[in-house]
Amino acid sequence: MIKKAITAMLIFCISLTAEAQKVYDIKKFGAKGDGKTNDAAAIQKAIDACSKTGGQVLIPAPFTFLAGPFNVKSNVDLHIEGGAKILASPDEKLYTESAFRENKGEGTIWIGGKNVENFSISGSGKIDGNGISFMGAEEEDAYILKPFNILDPRPHVFTIIGGKNIRIKDVHIGNSAYWTIHLVGCNDVVISGITLLNSLKVRNSDGIDLDHSKNVRISDCYIESGDDCICLKNRREFEEFGACENITVTNCTMTSSSCAIKIGSENMDAIRQVVFNNCIIKKSNRGVGIQNRDEGTVSDVIFSNMIIEGQLTTDTWWGKAEPIYVTAYSRASGNHKDANWRFPKGATEGKVGAISNIYFTNIQCFGENGVYVSGETKDKIKNIVFEDVNVSIDKTSNFPGGVYDRRPSKLDGFVKGSTSGFYFDTAESIKVQNCSVTWGKNKPDYFKYAVESKNVAILKVNNLDGEAAFPEKYEAVKK
């Protein structure tokens, strides 16, 4: 009798759950799934209906749904079954909404949403940005970008502006022509277990961009991108959303032709209270980059338990194989080639905020360059701490070394200098504690010191394990 009662109760609960979770199959709203027909209207109808009641919009397998732009809405779980795909239409004329409001020169929106709450993407299917369709000719290191007049039609894959309670889990997303996941002014976000694969030859193909967003948790993701894999920033077009803060990134593996983990360069507010932990960066042009170029500040950031592998590539991509890169320079101004009309003129032009309270601990660095820290003036770099950071440098490619990359800034983009384990230039306070520097077999003459310092007010080096690349010629620590 008791067993029957329990069974009846379970059946009742399951039926309630099934009733509560309404499913809206896009095929029932007219989607063809033949990979040729534009199914955006059918997908939009399903989303609109689901948003009114709450529930799931089903992208069923084994179909490919070609689609132009459409918008997601609140109270919807966009579920993409394994074997199903949403594919961006290659028709550039369909993409008319700028990704950055009045700034029309940096891409458009494919899958978008504004003021969206309680939205999720789930399932093991694919969202494919069809990025190569929007590219010009393929060269050895990158695709050429097609010329445009006013609106750059390259679509960002997924953009939410002003979102709350956003969940993106398990999906395969990528092949983007521009940024892949752009979250603007979002609060309470979880991105977990996704596979994000972009071409390593597509410029601007960022993985995840957190823009003025708060309380975001990213974990257990695999990301390959031509541009930054994960980037935190504060774009000027969305200044009403305030600081980017309270961000954690854990257990992710990344590869980038540019910078795997980036903070900046666009930053007109504050980026603070950020933790990156248990991450692996493989074969990237730059590993971790804090690249401040605007008046906003960066503070209270921890990088821990990481393996970083850097390698040189062509000048198309920002970076010179620095495993760790911390810089604060004013952005290029006027008609300088690195300036753009999207940046302000007047009171804030030419100003750069400080980087302070940054901690690097238990990090293994391998590659063709060392750690680089530099500020425009001493007060822009404060309290940078390296503890148990081990740097191993070897020349493994044919690309020229002995160069640091300061783009985009009003300074010369490339500056020649010695390659040292830790290279510090113009800062207020830096500490190196229990760190090591080792050199490989291939040592060009520009490989020099374990630690090199210029114009640093307070530098503390304690318990350093390592020597110069050529100890018979140079001391271990050069001040």
Task: Identify the role of each PLM range.
Residues 17-479:
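Extracellular/periplasmic carbohydrate-active domains that bind, remodel
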